[in-house]
Amino acid sequence: MLRTSLIGALAMGLTLGLAGPLQAEAPDNEGPQFEDPRHAVTWRREELKGIERLVRQLRFDLVNNRDARGAEPRLEELTQLASGAHLLPAFIEGSHGRGSEARARIWEEWEEFEAGFLALEERVAALREAAEAEDYRLATRELSDLSLTCRSCHRRYRY
């Protein structure tokens, strides 16, 4: 268990270390800015993979282990990472070409795409509330709803 946690922490550190030079924080601290759309694609792909890993770990924490306290740091991290403020700046118009799974439809339907992130933030907040209440049945349902929210956006906007 400890070895798995250490390997996961090292992998996350390596991912963040590699992604760090690709982007800079916006002057107003609203999120990252990118000099090159390819950097944005690489960064957002790694961030989304990280979110997926967090959700899998939270499912293990909350459903299998029923450990809300152990899940707290991951819930906090998920709240920060799975937000429009964090991810939307990486969806630079036209960054749907080579190396990206994004469809051009994202920029044609930008408001709907943004609304998907609001729905995601709401699902994460609901999951946190369930975990804080140590309501594991509700947390299980919220994890499923969170996954459905991700999936609905992926079906519409990802190849």
What is the predicted role of each segment?
Residues M1-R3:
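N-terminal secretory signal peptides that target proteins for export/translocation
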Residues S5-G17:
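Bacterial N-terminal signal peptides
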Residues G20-A24:
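Sec/Tat signal peptide C-region and signal peptidase I cleavage site
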Residues E25-F34, R38-G70, E76-Y159:
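Sequence context surrounding c-type heme c attachment/ligation sites in exported
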